Amino acid sequence: MSWKTICWEAILLGFLFSCTGSDKDPMDRKYQIDYDYLKSNFQQPDRTYGVNCWWWWLNGNVTKEAITKDLEAMKSRNFQGAMIFDAGGHNQRGNKDIPAGPLFGSEEWTELFVFALDEAKRLGLEIGFNIQSGWNLGGPCVTPQYAAKQLTYSERKVTGGKTLRLQLAEPDIYKGFYKDIVVLAFPSNKENKTNEPVSNLDLKLGFHELGGSAPDCRFLLENNTRGREKKTDKTIYLIDIARIVDLTTQMDEKGLFSWDAPEGDWNIMRIGYTCTRSEVSTSSRDWQGNVLDYMDRNAFDYYWNTIVEPILQAAGEKHVGSTLKFMETDSWECGGMNWTDAFADEFRSYCGYDLKLYLPLIAGHVVDNIDTSNAFLADFRKTIAHLVATNHYACFAEHAHQHNMGIQPESAGPHAGPLDGMKNYGFSDIVMSEFWSPSPHRPRPQDRFFIKQASSAAHIYGKKIVGAESFTTIGPHWNDELWHDQKSAFDHEICAGLNRVYFHTFTCSPAEQGIPGQEYFAGTHVNPRVTWWSKSAPFIDYMHRVQMLAQEGTFVADILYYYGDHVPNVYPFKHSDMPGAMFGFDYDVTDENILMKLGVKDGDIVVPGGRKYKVLVLPDHRILSLPVLKKLEMLVKEGASVLGPKPQKAVSLFGGEKGAAEFKKLVDLLWGTTIGTTGQNQYGKGFVSWGITAKEYLLSRNQPVDFAVEGNDSKTDFDYIHYVIDDAHVYFVSNQTTERQKIDACFRVSGLQPELWNALTGEIREAGAFTQKDEKTVVPLTLEPYGSMFVVFHKKIDRNKQGAKAGNDPDYEILQTLDGAWTVNFDPEWGGPSSVVFPELIDWTRHSDKRIKYFSGTAVYNKKFTVNFEKNPANRYYLQLENVKDVGIASVCINGKDKGIVWTKPFRVDITDGLKEGENDVVVEVTNSWFNRVAGDEMAVSPTKYTQTNIVLGNDFRGNAVSEITLEPSGLLGPVTIQVAVEQK
């Protein structure tokens, strides 16, 4: 460091300290202000912490009236903003077509777009937009020159010992585009035939993406039969690379080839590249076209200048960078691509060697041996991922930043395209992922939750917002049960690091499309046309409160997990727990790009932004790159703790034979030459350990768990996330079961008063029950089914102080059951009877009256009852509805006093100040979803059709017709009880 730099840093530090007052500790003052800010914004969150949405403009079919109605509805629910997403998808999976509106980017479409910006500005909402119609970048403007490319070849066998003059056949060509790369020859004698081909070759070459979401891709590093094998009778050769001959100069531009061929049998390969068959997916009508070449910066520049720049120019300075803040592209769902014009040069620059002699692999031949071939293929895929990151996502960010805008592409899966997700995320301004609600299409958690990789990138790169396309499903439609489906999924992903929901979907639907109107074929529909919109505020407010604290917090983790340097590389959901952290510790995920920048301070592993971890955990597949191994040697030497199995081989051909020798030397240096199943080796100031989990390792180093539920070590019953906000510790604790749970929650905090912050209500109270011991605080919590609570530690107390109460939440005793008859009023405008008496509470779908059986909307339950117990003014009394279907949302009024809306189990409201001695009148409004009414209309159960939509409920999620539409249980099912709160003992 130069003397000039030292002086400048001293001046800067002096200036910073001079900005603080000397009369009191500036940290105390800042801390007090921030804490008050947290409390006020928790109770009534600012709009900036609100939810956002994928605002679908399906087939371009929107109107100014519908735009205004939607934006005003968003404002009424305190939305932060909306992401305009022009797309098709309305007619997928057996659903019906809708009219076509203006084409994306056309003059008419852009006029509607600018109108939406004007309205959003008027309402104080932020707008983003997806820069194409459909899922992946491309469209009718993308000519073959700029389209995605793939390798292609032709091959023929010849006999040498003479001069050959041949017309080499053109390889398969798509979309009229082809360019040659190289012509190669290699011996093809029976002696070098092999029966051991490279497995999963099309996947390893990037011709296809892996199926499913967040699959384990590590099998691509080795030779095994997992994945999708293509059966072939083709003869496969094992080729000595030294005998492969580059004959490119022997072929003219017309494919005429001449060669004085040596004796023996030879294979001649003409290798080039053409367009892939990929087309833009799920676009509006007339936006079909080629997928863009994601590896070519010129292709992105062309698309930007042709499509995006004119839209921004139309939006103008009054919107761009202010109302119009972010741009998006959707997740990779465009198949494979494995070549671009400059690929050979880029490969040489990135990997350090020439790739051409390895290209017989595309025909299935083995070059040198299986290990060498697989190592080359790993380098090949890493180069694809590198080019996608630097020539597509980095280029996207550069263009956006020139307009004072940010980007938020879903650039890391969960589909396993040729991506390094963590590297891509480094170019994002908002880190985006997705998660799904439970449904027949995706019932398993590992198929629905993908936030961990995105949140790790945000933590490491210092990005504030971790967003997600949220609550995606593929059918059935409108039958969401908020407490069971949406809240459980939201809380699960909050614990993985989510801090902003983007509702998928919020569809713009013109009035002429009726009610519930046009909808996307997938997603949880949230918009002003759903039956329960008028009661949606508490559900959305809950998410706002949770997001506020999550966005303000700094994540706490002890473990950094390196998930390998292979491509594709998509980390699965948090509970896959590859480092072995759970339950009790948390972790971040990192890739090679970040690992190469790690440092060590006081034994902690430090990322460039300053975040610290206690241990670095390696993947268990025993394959690493030489650069990573060199970096590990440096980290351990300086004092880092590294945990993982001894590597067996290098993932790459980088460094050649010299590199392979260095790799073995470093492995033996770090792990030792002879090791058992478990053990530890000291090197320099640090240690390398193996054979134990990260949790076991940290406990062995006397690092206490960050969070625990005493007596329950389940990884699935409970979850948590820990943030620090200034000097406050903020824990979000989630019950991930359908049962009420009483737990003793143990936190790695002491000397601070625990507070309970209830995101359902905004209530903040000090915990009266807690114990401090061994630098930990144990707080009794009662969590309702899929319930949650923030536990906040802020105010200093004596470390020996203990809470005075036995519990922090009451139990509830039933005093009276409101059984017997209820009068129920349905809305005749939606086909229901104006008034009917239920002798007892019943599921509407079991009623003999079809007007009730197929009803959708709000029904008003009325009941008069006489209190049969003596009220005690010291008690709190509650009305518990217990079971509300199908959305699970209701409002309660007693004796004319509104007691609010309930949407979570057990649907309990405080009626203390409304309940009176003698006769009482209770009114319960219950709202179900559109599902049953749409089903009834589809089956023509009534001469009157009440609904209009493109969605067909008579198909399953695959689009296949079902024999019968099963209706969704609906209504107030009870039992309805009056309960009294009693102190826990």
Task: Tell where the protein language model's regions lie, with residue ranges.
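Mature extracytoplasmic enzyme cores
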Residues: 33-45, 50-52, 59-62, 66-68, ...
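Bacterial N-terminal signal peptides that target proteins for export
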Residues: 1-8
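Bacterial Sec signal peptide processing site at the extreme N-terminus
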Residues: 21-27
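Short, hydrophobic/aromatic-enriched beta-strand segments in well-ordered soluble domains
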Residues: 268-273, 789-796, 863, 921-928
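Carbohydrate-binding surfaces of carbohydrate-active enzymes
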Residues: 49, 67-68, 81, 99, ...
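Aromatic-lined ligand-binding clefts that engage carbohydrates, nucleic acids, or primary amines
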Residues: 746, 865-895, 901-902, 922-926
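An acidic-aromatic loop/edge-strand motif
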Residues: 135-137, 142, 157-160, 172-175, ...
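C-terminal motif of bacterial Sec signal peptides marking the signal peptidase cleavage site
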Residues: 17-18
